[in-house]
Each structure stands twice: as structure tokens, then as C-alpha cells.
Amino acid sequence: MACNTLVNSWGDYDYWFHTHVWFLKSFAEPGNTLPFLYTQKDRGIIDFNEERDYVLTYVLSDFRGNEVRYSFTVRGEKTEIPEPVQEEGTIFRWNQTNSYSLPGMHLIVPYGLLTKNTLLTPTSKARQGKLSDSYSFYPTSCPLVTSGEISFYVNKDVDASKVYVACDGVFAGGDYQDGWVTGRVNDLGAWYGLAYDDEAPEVTPVSLGDHIVLKLTDTKSGVASYRATIDGRFVVFDKVDKKPLVTCDLSETPIRKTLRTHQLRFTAIDNRNNEQVFETNIIY
């Protein structure tokens, strides 16, 4: 998983995020540990420090030894380097564990989750009637190598087992300890806040024939698991890709076709342990 997300650092992720065009960098960021990247101590960064032509050649080869070369010339010209502009914000450094706190909120990004120094620009939005404000830490998408942590203090008298951290409205964990609820942070540019879910998922029959189709919906913490039995015997329901549906082909279950009545019991549980039981009779 870490290697997959490290590819974001090897490419120009910000350009891809805005254009969906992917370019690879000719250098490695200091915290990029992709095992197939090899550079010298300069990490592939070229210092054009003379007024002359520099001929660069890129060689791309595959495992069969086929290769293609592309050469081009960069003309070195003396240029005045402007003074760096001091931007406001908090710098998270790639080579250490970083943290950031506000009243009732604490963010931790452990060592190894950033591939370069990153300037945080924390932003908050007030949410009237909610358990917390919402927070974002970067002006655009900024994925981490793996998950960091964000914690919120629960300052209202509610059932803590129903509180969770939402990331852009999607469940992102909810471990409660000593008044704090902790969830996952995968992208510093997403919005995080507390949410509450004491409502069970909905189970709606779509088809109850030989091929059973049920619709599962949960608009808050999301469905975590489900289990089904027919006449007390376990049967498998498969999820349908990109749709809130689960299906069961009765011909692939232990239930024999006798054209008699059978009882289907389907239990769905969401990420805050709210449970919905759907029962019906089917003829098979």
C-alpha cells in the first residue's frame, strides 16, 4: 500500500489532480523510499550553474532490454534568484513526527508519511449544532503515504459509541478514549470533523426470486458488515461493484430447490454498530 501512495510523490501529483495528465519527476523527493528509485546524493536534481549548453539524455528501457533515448538541450543563462517569500503557516517536516493542535482538535502525522516538507495552512468551518467544527490543513489534495491520526474532544453529553470522525462526509474511524475520538487522516486537503450515527442501515428488497437482490443504504457511518441465513443456514451474498446492492444466487447455496417456503434473515450492521434485521419468506 505504501509503495502505491509513494508513486504520488514520484509523479507531479498536484498537476495530475487538476488536469488528470501524469508526468514523472526526474528527481526523488527526500522522503520517497520507492524501492526501484536509485539516485546519487543530489537525488537527481541538476544544478545548471554555468552559462553554456547542457545536453540531457533520458533513457527508458524495459525488462527485455528494449530501450528508447530522448535528448534535448538546456541553455544555461545567468538569472537573478529572487528572495524566498516567507509564507504563513506551519511547516510539517518529512524527516520527523509532526503534530498540530487547536482547542478540541489534535493532528498527528508520524515520521515517514510525508516525502517532503509541507506547509500547512489550517482552515476551519463552523458547524452549528454539530459535535465539532470541520478542519482542513492544505488548500488542495495532499495525500499521505499511510494514515495519520486526528482526534476531536467530545464536549457534549452524547453516546460516545455513536460518534465517529468523518472525512468529507465518509467514515474515517472513531476510537473513543478519555473524551477524545480518533480517526484516520489520509489526505491533508480533505475536511475532517465529528459526526453522529444512531440510525440503522436500510435493507430494501429488489428481487426475491431465484436470484435475490437486496439494496443496502446507510447515509451516515456506512455499512460495515452483513450476514444472511435461509432457514438458519448461512448463505453468501456478493457485493455488486459501484452499486449499493448485494446478490445471492440460490442455485449456489446449500438450499435445495423444492418450491417450498423458506425464511430469509438478513442482518446489516453499520460502523457504529447500529443493526437492521430484514426477514421475509421466499419460495424456492
Give, region by region, the residue ranges found by the protein language model.
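Long, low-complexity serine/threonine/glycine- and acidic-rich segments characteristic of extracellular
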Residues: 1-77, 173, 183, 219-284
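Proteolytic processing hotspots in large secreted/extracellular or virion-associated proteins
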Residues: 86-95, 120-166
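Short proline/glycine-enriched turn/loop motifs at strand-loop junctions of beta-rich domains
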Residues: 112-116, 156-160, 186-189, 218-223
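Short, solvent-exposed loop/linker segments at the N-terminal edge
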Residues: 142-144, 204-208
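Proline-centered linker/hinge motifs at extracellular inter-domain junctions
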Residues: 198-202, 223
